[in-house]
Amino acid sequence: MTEIHDFDKSEWDIKGSIAPIQPTTYSDGRLVPQVRVTDPGLGDRKDECFMYMFLLGVVEDSDPLGPPIGRAFGSLPLGVGRSTAKPEELLKEATELDIVVRRIAGLNEKLVFYNNPPLTLLTPWRKVLTTGSVFNANQVCNAVNLIPLDTPQRFRVVYMSITRLSDNGYYTVPRRMLEFKSVNAVAFKLLVTLRIHKAIGPGKIIDNAEQLPEATFMVHIGNFRRKKSEVYSADYCKMKIEKMGLVFALGGIGGTSLHIRSTGKMNKTLHAQLGFKKTLCYPLMDINEDPNRLLWRSRCKTIRIQAVLQPSVPQEFRIYDDVIINDDQGLFKVL
């Protein structure tokens, strides 16, 4: 049984949207580098120099003898660094990087990124750029199947997204807690609906709401659980959620991210599951990579956030992690 509770628009109205990166080109057709700065916080951090950096660009053939052939559009999350440089200065150095891209495979397909030239302004992000980093291919590339293996590839930076970390603490919930299930508990999740504003040309955006596509994603917050074997009612859980005083914002962590701040009283069990933190960040890159890629450059606006209450462990379902073929019986065997 699923119960849905709508949050009031005022709880995300201030910072519930992200500005677009409008593509403009040079006379030869090359994209003009741009930087976008987002601040989803409330500004209570004393040091304002911490920021999250996310690069967008083209994966193309690294051929010095001829014009590069673009293969796919990709991203490179650099993570958090501390810098007093201007965004335009950081963008200029990023466009001068020589980032090598390699396509590999493990449990799934992955992309490897590493940079060759020395760094100056981007030194706070040297660990990712110099040592190299590996990402699931679908998280950072819109068409990994088009990237060849027999031709050297490079990542040419075109856009930069900076998210200022002005809140006093940004925290990601431990992954184990996101998968934690408990009998006789009520799972508290959020269903977020975004409206995507499409660019139809330089400086032009479709603003007619009837023509705009929508994207939804769901995040797991935690579980309401009683000490006894009884289960909380949906009305009781809704009351607890209202007392939390949740405020929502959109940021650019990993592309697009949902930022949540509790300004009220939080259920003790739920608070413990969240690491006793009241400022949370859920990157869409980890939650649902398809809409995240769609939103890399688009303007998006939050139009609805709903609390979803579901049984923590549905009794009618079993959860299987792996399915293999049993050679002895010639049948599928579930482990």
Curated annotation (Swiss-Prot):
UniProt keyword Transport, yes or no: no
Subcellular location: Virion; Host cell membrane
Keywords per UniProt: Host cell membrane, Host membrane, Host-virus interaction, Lipid-binding, Membrane, Viral envelope protein, Viral matrix protein, Virion
GO biological process: virion assembly
Gene Ontology, cellular component aspect: host cell plasma membrane; membrane; viral envelope
MF GO annotations: lipid binding; structural constituent of virion
Similarity comment text for this entry: Belongs to the morbillivirus/respirovirus/rubulavirus M protein family.
Subunit composition and interactions: Homodimer. Dimerization is critical for virion formation. Interacts with host ANP32B.
Name by which UniProt lists this protein: Matrix protein
Organism of this sequence: Measles virus (strain IP-3-Ca) (MeV)
